Structure formats: structure tokens, C-alpha cells
């Protein structure tokens, strides 16, 4: 059984609104990480990010901020070219006061460029979540384990896979990959089977060696997300049994 951190995903249109800020404050005891999505912004990413981070700092709560730009190819709204995406992440790493950054992984990407970016993040004392998302299916167990293995080779702090299940067997496949990888890899493992079918992957993550579960404060930002308070309660239930 591993300790599982709760990440609350927020995706402001521009600045964080009063309701979201109040919710973060109200449920701060249930939140370990605030995932700030920025792919919904069409432009002014660095300017808006600076303002959002200042808003979160003013709350004075004990939670790390994870900045995520999710591309269309991995289920987000981000339309940047890969080169522009990598440049944006470099600027965020060097110039913004967040504690964590999400870096997408794909088998077609330049391994050396990704390793350099992760090393840069570590030089600026930022933790790295390297992530892979598949909104169409759950790959075979061997592909999932190999993906975790390849991501781990880049020396991130966390390796994350989120996939779409078609049935309960797909959920079991994802959780088996999480359990095996958690026992063998240096990085902390995150595994999410999306939608209602995969809810157990969020609530029982710690049973299988997972380390972070993503929830919401209002409207879910990914299929199957539940409110952070409910998520925290469910995680505690599994940790006490």
C-alpha cells in the first residue's frame, strides 16, 4: 500500500474565478497537488500562468502546483506544434514558480530532447510528471509495462499513464501494469483507467502501488474524475483496510 496524493485539476478560462479559489481554500485539507491546466488558453500562456500562480500563492495553502499543457493528440485542447510546446515548457521551467510540470511522452518523440527538458526541470527544482494518454483504448499489458519502462529511463519523478477501458478486463490490465511497474521502477507510478468503468483505479490506486489520483472541484476535467473530498475519503477507506 502506497501513500496516494490527491491532485485537484482546474482549467480556468483566463484567471481563476472566485468560486474556484474558494473551493480550493475550502477543500485544501483534501488537496496535495493543484493541477493547473493551461492548454485551454489560445495565447498569452506565460502571462496568464504568472497571474494564476500569483492567485494560488495568495491562498497560502500547502499544495504543490503542477502545470499541464495537454495537447489535442493526448486528449487536451492544445494546438501548438511540438516544437512550440517544448519551447513553452522550457520557459515555464525557467521563469515560473510552480513546483511540478507535466511533460507528455510519445514513442515518436526525440528522447534526447525530452531527457534534456527533464534535466532542466530538475536543475530548477521542479518535479516532473511524464505522461501518456490514450482516450481510445487500453493497450495490451506488455505495451503498458514497456511504456512505463521507457518513460522511467528519462529519469522523471513520476510516470503517468491514463487509458480508456472498454470493460472491466481493461481496468484489471491497467492496474496489473501499475503494480508491476511500481515494484520495479525508480519513478513513482500513476495509472488511471478513465470513465466510470475505471473508477476503482482512482480510488484504490494505493493498493496497486500508484501514487497520485486526480479529482475535480466542480466539472470533471477528464472522464471519470470525482470530487476531491470524495476521492480523499475513498483513498483513506482503502488505506485503512
Swiss-Prot record:
InterPro entries: Aldolase_TIM, DHquinase_I, Type-I_3-dehydroquinase
Active site as annotated: 133 (proton donor/acceptor), 160 (schiff-base intermediate with substrate)
Residues annotated to bind 3-dehydroquinate: 35-37, 70, 202, 225
Gene3D superfamilies linked to this entry: Aldolase class I
Gene Ontology biological process: 3,4-dihydroxybenzoate biosynthetic process; amino acid biosynthetic process; aromatic amino acid family biosynthetic process; chorismate biosynthetic process
EC number(s) given by UniProt: 4.2.1.10
Involved pathway(s): Metabolic intermediate biosynthesis; chorismate biosynthesis; chorismate from D-erythrose 4-phosphate and phosphoenolpyruvate: step 3/7
Transmembrane segments: none
Catalytic reaction list: 3-dehydroquinate = 3-dehydroshikimate + H2O
Function: Involved in the third step of the chorismate pathway, which leads to the biosynthesis of aromatic amino acids. Catalyzes the cis-dehydration of 3-dehydroquinate (DHQ) and introduces the first double bond of the aromatic ring to yield 3-dehydroshikimate.
Subunit description: Homodimer.
The family this protein is said to belong to: Belongs to the type-I 3-dehydroquinase family.
Protein name stated in the entry: 3-dehydroquinate dehydratase
Lineage: Bacteria, Bacillati, Bacillota, Bacilli, Bacillales
Name of the coding gene: aroD
Amino acid at each position: 500500500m502506497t501513500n496516494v496524493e490527491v491532485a485537484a485539476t482546474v482549467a480556468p478560462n483566463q484567471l481563476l474565478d472566485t468560486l474556484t479559489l474558494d473551493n480550493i481554500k475550502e477543500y485544501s485539507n483534501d488537496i496535495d497537488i493543484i493541477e493547473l491546466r493551461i492548454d485551454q488558453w489560445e495565447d498569452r500562456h506565460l502571462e496568464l500562468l504568472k497571474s494564476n500562480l500569483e492567485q494560488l500563492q495568495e491562498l497560502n495553502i500547502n499544495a504543490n502546483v503542477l502545470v499541464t499543457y495537454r495537447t489535442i493528440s493526448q486528449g487536451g485542447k492544445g494546438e501548438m506544434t511540438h516544437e512550440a510546446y517544448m519551447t513553452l515548457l522550457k520557459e515555464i521551467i525557467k521563469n515560473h514558480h510552480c513546483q511540478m510540470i507535466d511533460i507528455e511522452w510519445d514513442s515518436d518523440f526525440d528522447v534526447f530532447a525530452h531527457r534534456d527538458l527533464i534535466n532542466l526541470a530538475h536543475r530548477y527544482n521542479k518535479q516532473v510528471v511524464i505522461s501518456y494518454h490514450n482516450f481510445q483504448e487500453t493497450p495490451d499489458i506488455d505495451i503498458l509495462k514497456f511504456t512505463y519502462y521507457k518513460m522511467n529511463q528519462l529519469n522523471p519523478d513520476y510516470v503517468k499513464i491514463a487509458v480508456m477501458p472498454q470493460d472491466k478486463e481493461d481496468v484489471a490490465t491497467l492496474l496489473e501494469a501499475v503494480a508491476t511497474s511500481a515494484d520495479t521502477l525508480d519513478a513513482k507510478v500513476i495509472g488511471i483507467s478513465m470513465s466510470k468503468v475505471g473508477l476503482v483505479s482512482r480510488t484504490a490506486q494505493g493498493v496497486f502501488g500508484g501514487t497520485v489520483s486526480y479529482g475535480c472541484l466542480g466539472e470533471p476535467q477528464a472522464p471519470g474524475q470525482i470530487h476531491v473530498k470524495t476521492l480523499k475519503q475513498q483513498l483513506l477507506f482503502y488505506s485503512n483496510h
